[in-house]
Swiss-Prot record:
Residues 1-32 are annotated as: Disordered. Keywords: Chloroplast, Plastid. GO terms for molecular function: enzyme activator activity. This is SufE-like protein 2, chloroplastic. It comes from Arabidopsis thaliana. One of its GO terms (biological process) is positive regulation of sulfur metabolic process. InterPro entries: Fe-S_metab-assoc_dom. Highly expressed in flowers and pollen, and at low levels in roots, leaves and stems.
């Protein structure tokens, strides 16, 4: 497997504080002066992820270690984030929360801002870099010229960075509906951002999986336009016994050509 050793796990957005935010909660001065998200009950504490309450949590305030015991499943992360946004009833509070997440997004190298990494269909410029690590887990980096779009990317990366390919493919756009953010008639464009970034993550994940399987079988890697992903009446792509990561019964939810 061809893996870049320099591609490191990204810092994930900070989880919700149980106390009223102070200036220290927002190291970026732009956000300390303009935004003060309303206090929210910590959703992490309300979800039983099967860990001992006295044992160290697999979460930290700033990062989720990919090497930590993965009782922290992708579905758990998604549920935590959805619960957080659901608790914010005012649209402006959701916008502020996204801006907070945008500030935590790791910078993307200038060399990655190329047309091949552009996410199509977004009203703003969004770049997405995807790799597969030596353990067969997906690694994502992203950036945008819009702070709101950066917030979307930050949330999706927190959910999916370090996930197995089948976990990436298992997330649907409707799973993100509770996190929709819209102010002044911009709801649809922002819903499209969620959708387009997620779809790009999934399409390119499938391309990397197919390329890796072909490489290990000694076959010619498939061209992107040769890949047709389709989900019909519960049909699935069977697991390959060649590669070393779990992709058994991978659902192909979408009907599209890359």
């Amino acid at each position: 497997m061809n893996t870049s050793s320099s591609f490191k796990a990204l810092a994930s957005p900070p989880l919700i504080s149980t106390s009223r935010p102070t200036t220290k909660s927002f190291p970026n001065p732009r956000f300390t002066s303009r935004f003060s998200p309303k206090p929210i009950t910590c959703m992490r504490d309300s979800l039983n992820l099967g860990s001992n309450p006295k044992a160290p949590s697999p979460f930290s305030l700033a990062t989720v270690s990919v090497d930590a015991p993965l009782g922290t499943k992708t579905s758990d992360k998604l549920r935590i984030l959805v619960s957080e946004f659901r608790s914010l009833t005012e649209p402006i509070d959701r916008v502020k929360r996204l801006l907070n997440y945008a500030a935590t997004l790791a910078p993307l190298d200038e060399s990655a801002r190329i047309s091949e990494n552009r996410v199509t269909g977004c009203t703003t410029q969004v770049w997405l870099e995807i790799k597969m690590d030596e353990f067969g887990r997906m690694r994502f980096k992203a950036d945008s010229d819009s702070e709101i779009s950066k917030g979307f990317c930050s949330c999706l990366i927190w959910i999916l960075d370090g996930a197995k390919p089948e976990e990436v493919m298992g997330v649907r756009s409707e799973d993100l509906s509770e996190m929709n953010v819209g102010v002044h008639g911009k709801e649809q464009s922002r819903v499209n951002t969620w959708h387009n970034v997620l779809m790009s993550m999934q399409k390119r994940t499938m391309t990397l999986v197919a390329t890796d399987v072909a490489h290990q079988r000694g076959q010619r890697p498939p061209h992107q336009h040769d890949l047709l992903f389709k989900y019909v009446n519960g049909s699935y792509m069977e697991s390959s016994k060649v590669h070393d990561y779990s992709i058994s019964l991978l659902p192909l939810y979408y009907d599209f050509i890359i």
